[in-house]
Structure formats: C-alpha cells, structure tokens
Amino acid sequence: MTEIVNIFKKPHYFNYFTFVIFFLIIFTLISRFIFLDYRAIHHDESLHGYYSWLLSNGFGYTHNPLMHGPLNFHLNALVFLIFGDSDYTLRIAPAVAGTFVVLTPFLFIKIIGRYPSILISVFLLISPIITYFSRFARNDIFIALVSIILIYQVFRYLYMVEGKKNLFLISICLGFIFCIKEISFIIIFILGSFSLIFSSFNPFIKHKLNLNYQFTNIFALLFLLSFPLSMPISSYVFNFFGINLVAPSGALNKIGMPIGNVAI
C-alpha cells in the first residue's frame, strides 16, 4: 500500500518555541547593533573609549577607580584591535553583552517554564533601560549579564546539577564581576546574606532544610573569595594603633612592594 506523504507536514525538529527563539534573536540583534554610531558619544564613553584606544595601541593600562573595573577597557581594546577604532566599534562589546542579557531567561527555563522565559525575554528586548545600556559603552550591561549567570550557577549548584563544577563556575563569575564594577560588592552581599540565613551557620534552621549543605558551601565560597578584597577597610583599625598596612590612595609602587612606613 502506497503511503501518501504530506510535504507540508512540519519536520519533527520544528516547533513554535524554536520559531519564537529564532525571531527573538533576530529582533534582539537588530535592536542592539543597528545605528550604533548615530548617537553622540557620552562623556563616560569618551573616557572608556580613549583609554581603551591607548591600550589597543600599546600604551598600556593603568587602573583608575574613577572609571570602575578593567574588563570594559580590555574588551574594547580587543574590539579595536580586530575591527578598528570608531564610534560604532566602541559600542560593539556592550551590544554583544546586551544581546545575551535578553536570552538569559532561557537559562532558567527548567525552573520557570517556556512561556515565562519567552515573556521575560520580550520584556528585556523592549525595555528602554536595557536597550539603552546595551548600546552604551560602559560597565552596566556587563555587570547585569555576569550577575544573571552567577545567580544561574548558584541555582544549578542548589539543585546539584553538576556539583563541584558549579562551584568552580561561580568562582569564575566572581572573578569577572569584581573586574567590572564596584556594585559587585552589593551583589555578593545580597547572595551571601541569603546563603548565610539558610546555611548550617544559622542555629534556628539548622537541620530543618535539605539544602543546608549547599547554602553553607555557597556562603563559604562567596565569603572566602570576597573577604580579601575588603582588607583595605582594616586600615581604619590598624592605623589607630600606628600600624600602616595599606598604601595611601594614589601610591605608584608596584602591588605588594613596600612604600614609606607601610608594613605590607
């Protein structure tokens, strides 16, 4: 018996979810990359662009807290090396990060489901704030992207998807987040406080939650990797006793080298 084949039948790999994702990516790329150089360069962008240009041309990079972390400058310098320097290329790196920000809800698809993921992505796509900072050569969109990935890895560890591998990826996210912007300390404080409340260190809920072990490990990891960066605060205590452990602001010595009466 001859089987009649319907040529209009959808292939097995096609579904409406794939269709939506495809067009979501297309519209996101258009909204992030079209006419990137039409808007005048903002004051902050001019600083980031200039020092990135110096780095890309071999003049080196000197960190200045006024302009936040170094990651933005290194990414811009890499783009300048590959595509040349222009108003358009200055905004390529944040545009790429902004594209991924729109797609990040799909990382949580097993937790929140397909339709909520699509809805959140659409809101991120049309959000004026997210769109603006996705086309703005500053650190804001990078911190948003890495923060979402960090939270995603925390969730994966809580559900023990890949165990120690997730802790390693959390550490990588922390490394990046501290290279972007100072708000990273607030983000780590929020995650750390939440983890501490539900960890084994809290005597009120100890042994009452199945996730005590995971929350304890997350808190320990966040604390141990973040605490060394807070050591300059110790200068207020040690200076009271006449012990100078922290170099003054603007010191030009190499990191780790003594300066004046500084002990370390």
Question: Which stretches of residues belong to each language-model region?
Answer:
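Membrane-integral, polyisoprenol-dependent glycosyltransferases
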Residues: 1-264
